[in-house]
């Protein structure tokens, strides 16, 4: 039976300007960058969506609800073309309109909220969606509050976990929190899930891939243990690649 997944969140364009620098500016001691190549890919929630489509057996059942004109929201990373060292990141300043309708149509087996806290979703919107759908996977840059209580699973990295510690200490949600810890894998419900060691080329988008793989596998199996293991494996493949990319089911 075909599964349906909806991804909700704010999107952008991830732009990678691959450069070389052979001299310093004459007026200031800063490197002069010569851009050799530029690669643009959809990022943030759109990257989660792309990964879900690439991993699921039912790509026609995958939908995305995101901000209009997401192409105007650009994160530009200036990266050395040879060492992959990132010189700097420049973000465009764009006001993102709030979601127009947070009523989710029936028929979705899973909803993924990928909230980068750029204005598309408020805490009230997230609470409403989680309350009105039984299987929401939540990944948010907001400091968590009681509005997140109804999420089926909360995926959170170390930095965001520390910011939301008060919430975790005062609520009973630990059995639904998946804490990602980079090269140390992730932690869920008292168990650590190790990840294969890999030479890291770029961490950009690894969290998106983890979230997509986790939700896809759980939608298929309803087994959170195997879903976390699968998500770890997918994320470890992505960090070996440059830029914001997707992982394909055929690799497994």
Cite the ranges covered by each PLM segment:
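Conserved phosphate-binding/catalytic region of the ribokinase-like
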Residues: 94, 107, 125-150, 165-252
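Conserved N-terminal subdomain of the carbohydrate kinase-like
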Residues: 3-5, 13-113, 123-125, 245-252
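Short beta-strand/turn micro-motifs composed of small residues
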Residues: 9, 53, 66, 140, ...
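Short hydrophobic/aromatic-enriched beta-strand-loop microsegments
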Residues: 59-64, 153-158, 193-195
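Active-site metal-binding loops of divalent metal-dependent hydrolases
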Residues: 10-11, 116, 209
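Generic enzyme active-site microenvironment
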Residues: 5-8, 112-113, 137, 155, ...
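Catalytic cores of large soluble enzymes that bind and process phosphate-bearing ligands
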Residues: 37-44, 117-121, 153, 160, ...
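Conserved beta-alpha-beta core of the PfkB/ribokinase-like small-molecule kinase fold
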Residues: 22-28, 75-93, 110-169, 184-185
């Amino acid at each position: 039976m075909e599964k349906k997944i909806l991804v909700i969140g704010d999107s952008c364009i991830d732009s990678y300007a691959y450069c070389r620098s052979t001299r310093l500016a004459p007026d200031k001691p800063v490197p002069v960058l010569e851009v050799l190549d530029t690669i643009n890919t959809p990022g943030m929630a759109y990257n989660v969506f792309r990964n879900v489509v690439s991993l699921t057996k039912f790509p026609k059942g995958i939908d995305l609800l995101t901000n209009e004109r997401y192409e105007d929201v650009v994160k530009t990373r200036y990266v050395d073309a040879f060492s992959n060292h990132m010189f700097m990141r420049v973000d465009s300043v764009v006001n993102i309109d709030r979601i127009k309708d947070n009523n989710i149509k029936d028929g979705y087996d899973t909803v993924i909220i990928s909230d980068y806290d750029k204005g598309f979703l408020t805490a009230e919107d997230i609470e409403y969606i989680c309350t009105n759908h039984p299987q929401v996977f939540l990944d948010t840059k907001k400091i968590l509050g009681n509005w997140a209580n109804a999420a089926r699973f909360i995926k959170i990295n170390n930095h965001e976990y520390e910011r939301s510690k008060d919430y975790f200490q005062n609520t009973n949600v630990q059995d639904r929190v998946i804490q990602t810890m980079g090269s140390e894998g992730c932690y869920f419900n008292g168990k650590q899930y190790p990840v294969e060691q890999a030479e890291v080329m770029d961490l950009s988008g690894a969290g998106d891939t983890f979230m997509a793989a986790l939700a896809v596998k759980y939608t298929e199996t309803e087994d959170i243990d195997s879903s976390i293991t699968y998500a770890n494996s997918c994320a470890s493949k992505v960090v070996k690649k440059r830029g914001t990319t997707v992982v394909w089911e055929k690799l497994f």
